[in-house]
Amino acid sequence: MYEYIIGKVTFVSPYYIVVETNGIGYQISVDNPYRYSGKMDTDIKLYLHQVVREDAQLLFGFGSLEEKQLFLKLISVSGIGPKSGLAIMASVADHGGLINAIEGEDVTYLTKFPGVGKKTAQQMILDLKGKLGELESSEAAVAAMTATEAVTTSNQALAEALEALSALGYSDREIKRITKQLEALGETTTDVYLSNALKFMMKR
């Protein structure tokens, strides 16, 4: 079982990043791959969670130990798998908002996450309420990882962001509903498009 990895980012896709260390490239699923676009060929440290299946061995990466702990709490809930847990974490810039929703039993807020219905939201509250307070300090680490990549062409960056939303589990209908809002941002980076898209999704 892996605890963390330190290596260079060599590839970024809507679904995962590749981190190379000692001549081996590790495919790692992260909540927002484009956060690492500005880290290409730079050493980073990710805390890892490994999922072993009959047909695959999957790695999920997190910028801080607190993020990893939050992810493990989420996937302990019946109905939330690793992909859903990662999508939930990607959908909120402030994980404190997620924690507050659970503590406040805000089912409406929780059902805004992709793949989370009323039953799963209620299960999240039942299983996690009162158990997440120690994780609220994780946001500083998330903010520190914000990429400073050069601006790519608007169409390419926007297309990458929309593809990343699809990878997180949002439907075509949901994505189309916020596309005009993203276009109104003008030319910017994929990470900025995606971060704003996730905020728009949570406000719908």
Swiss-Prot record:
Region Flexible linker, residue ranges: 144-152
Localization of this protein: Cytoplasm
Keywords: Cytoplasm, DNA damage, DNA recombination, DNA repair, DNA-binding
Molecular function terms from GO: ATP binding; four-way junction DNA binding; four-way junction helicase activity
Record lineage: Bacteria, Bacillati, Bacillota, Bacilli, Lactobacillales
A GO term from the CC aspect: cytoplasm
Region (Domain I): 1-63
Assembly, per entry: Homotetramer. Forms an RuvA(8)-RuvB(12)-Holliday junction (HJ) complex. HJ DNA is sandwiched between 2 RuvA tetramers; dsDNA enters through RuvA and exits via RuvB. An RuvB hexamer assembles on each DNA strand where it exits the tetramer. Each RuvB hexamer is contacted by two RuvA subunits (via domain III) on 2 adjacent RuvB subunits; this complex drives branch migration. In the full resolvosome a probable DNA-RuvA(4)-RuvB(12)-RuvC(2) complex forms which resolves the HJ.
Region of interest: Domain II: 64-143
Species for this entry: Enterococcus faecalis (strain ATCC 700802 / V583)
A biological process term (GO) from this entry: DNA repair
Name of the featured protein: Holliday junction branch migration complex subunit RuvA
Free-text comment about domains: Has three domains with a flexible linker between the domains II and III and assumes an 'L' shape. Domain III is highly mobile and contacts RuvB.
The protein's role, per its UniProt record: The RuvA-RuvB-RuvC complex processes Holliday junction (HJ) DNA during genetic recombination and DNA repair, while the RuvA-RuvB complex plays an important role in the rescue of blocked DNA replication forks via replication fork reversal (RFR). RuvA specifically binds to HJ cruciform DNA, conferring on it an open structure. The RuvB hexamer acts as an ATP-dependent pump, pulling dsDNA into and through the RuvAB complex. HJ branch migration allows RuvC to scan DNA until it finds its consensus sequence, where it cleaves and resolves the cruciform DNA.
InterPro entries: DNA_helicase_Holl-junc_RuvA_I (IPR013849), Hlx-hairpin-Hlx_DNA-bd_motif (IPR003583), NA-bd_OB-fold (IPR012340), RuvA (IPR000085), RuvA_2-like (IPR010994), RuvA_C (IPR011114), RuvA_C_sf (IPR036267)
Similarity comment: Belongs to the RuvA family.
HAMAP family for this protein: DNA_HJ_migration_RuvA (MF_00031)
Annotated stretches, region: Domain III: 153-204
